[in-house]
Swiss-Prot record:
Coiled coil feature spans: none
Keyword Cytoplasm tagged: yes
Designated name of the protein: Probable transaldolase
Keyword entries, A-Z: Cytoplasm, Pentose shunt, Schiff base, Transferase
Classification via NCBIfam families: fsa_talC_mipB
Pathway membership: Carbohydrate degradation; pentose phosphate pathway; D-glyceraldehyde 3-phosphate and beta-D-fructose 6-phosphate from D-ribose 5-phosphate and D-xylulose 5-phosphate (non-oxidative stage): step 2/3
Source organism of this protein record: Clostridium acetobutylicum (strain ATCC 824 / DSM 792 / JCM 1419 / IAM 19013 / LMG 5710 / NBRC 13948 / NRRL B-527 / VKM B-1787 / 2291 / W)
Length: 215
């Protein structure tokens, strides 16, 4: 499973990109607003750091507006992916944008049916939301498995991005369920790095080294 980082914070992106573990970035209006900077400015800076898919989301709710905004987002950089909400108007926009060769990421997916519709409309990516499904007691990983199964049976090339990830367990469960990509918040990526036994092991190695050579 490939890993993206889910943030609009440039410093977080730089830090994680330097580790060599991510190959893309997802943003949304909330994440960009949190940075208090111009959308285009933030996105352009991100494209200069990560050479991979960068999702930027439309604000419009009607198909015409989404298409217009999507075309503008696509012009920013060759790696841009237009993030579209899973609605009737969103599907119309995806159909048009995909026909123009513009990559799309249909977001706010909460059912296998929604994922199938988005894929058939031409979506490059679909983003089922794990954390929000967990909040209502739904089986989020079961949803990933269902979408993977449907796409495999019918040879659908749309990639599945596990989104709304809140813990390292979400990441591992998504990978085991067959998601192509997990888009992971900075905090969770950092949590994935650490393990108490790793720290203990390093301390023991250093102690043994000092005892052997620094007598």
């Amino acid at each position: 499973m490939k890993l993206f980082i889910d943030t609009a914070n440039v410093e977080e992106i730089k830090e994680v990109n330097d580790m060599g573990v991510i190959c893309g970035v997802t943003t949304n209006p909330s994440l960009v607003a949190k940075e208090g900077r111009d959308f285009n400015e933030v996105i352009r800076e991100i494209t200069s750091i990560v050479d991979g898919p960068i999702s930027g989301e439309v604000i419009a709710l009607d198909a015409e507006g989404m298409i217009k905004e999507g075309r503008e987002i696509a012009k920013i950089h060759k790696n841009m992916v237009v993030k579209i909400p899973m609605t009737e108007e969103g599907l119309k926009a995806v159909k048009v944008l995909s026909s123009e060769g513009i990559k799309t990421n249909v977001t706010l997916i909460f059912s296998a049916g929604q994922a199938l519709l988005a894929a058939r409309a031409g979506a490059t990516f679909v983003s089922p939301f794990l954390g929000r499904l967990d909040d209502i007691g739904a089986d989020s990983i079961g949803l990933i498995e269902s979408i993977v199964n449907i796409f495999d049976i019918h040879d659908i090339r749309t990639e599945i991005i596990a989104a709304s990830i809140r813990s390292p367990k979400h990441v591992i469960d998504s990978a085991e369920a067959g998601a192509h990509i997990g888009t992971v918040p900075y905090k969770v990526l950092k949590q994935l790095i650490k393990h108490p036994l790793t720290d203990i092991g390093i301390e023991r190695f250093m102690k043994d080294w000092k005892e052997a050579f620094n007598k």
